[in-house]
Regions:
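Catalytic-site neighborhood detector that most strongly recognizes the C-terminal catalytic loop/helix
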Residues: 19-23, 109-136
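Short, charged phosphate-coordinating catalytic segments
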Residues: 1-12, 103-104
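Conserved strand-loop elements at the edges of beta-sheets that form or border functional pockets
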Residues: 33, 86, 124
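Generic alpha-helical segment signature
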Residues: 63-64, 130
Length: 137
């Protein structure tokens, strides 16, 4: 929710996570083709807003505001009992089911702590490869 304009690269289809609980969480996250238009529309709805994701009034989304105002009501409407973290778990599962390389999955979700030394030192993926992977789900 803390995506500032300078950390979002819509033309290249990714955003930079620059604040995380762990060093491994700092990464480039691909934006799937399916949702790119939503990111663009949200951004264009308030070009002067500092943050990509914002309230209708152009204010920064706090997690609790987002969860209570958007996520929870949507889950209730759909009859689904899930948290935002469940979405992360589902993403990992869908990527694995799609046959995506485990190292790419770890890069996307920031699990580099679970990487082997070889994966950390010798494997590098450009953002196009990460976008291609996320587009398979």
């Amino acid at each position: 929710l803390d995506l500032k304009e300078e950390n979002v690269h819509l033309n290249e289809q990714y955003f930079d996570v620059i604040c995380s609980k762990t060093e491994n969480g700092i990464r480039k996250v691909p934006i799937a083709d399916k949702v790119l238009s939503y990111y663009k529309a949200w951004y264009e709805s308030c070009p002067e807003c500092e943050y990509l994701l914002h309230t209708e009034a152009g204010k920064h989304f706090e997690y609790r505001n987002y969860y209570d105002s958007y996520f929870k009501p949507l889950m209730e409407q759909l009859g689904i009992n899930r948290t935002p973290h469940c979405c992360r778990h589902t993403c990992i599962s869908l990527l694995a089911e799609a046959g995506i390389n485990q190292t790419i999955i770890k890069k996307i979700v920031g699990h580099s702590g679970a990487m082997t030394l070889t994966e950390k030192v010798y494997t590098h993926f450009d953002i196009k490869e990460l976008v291609d992977a996320i587009n398979k789900i």
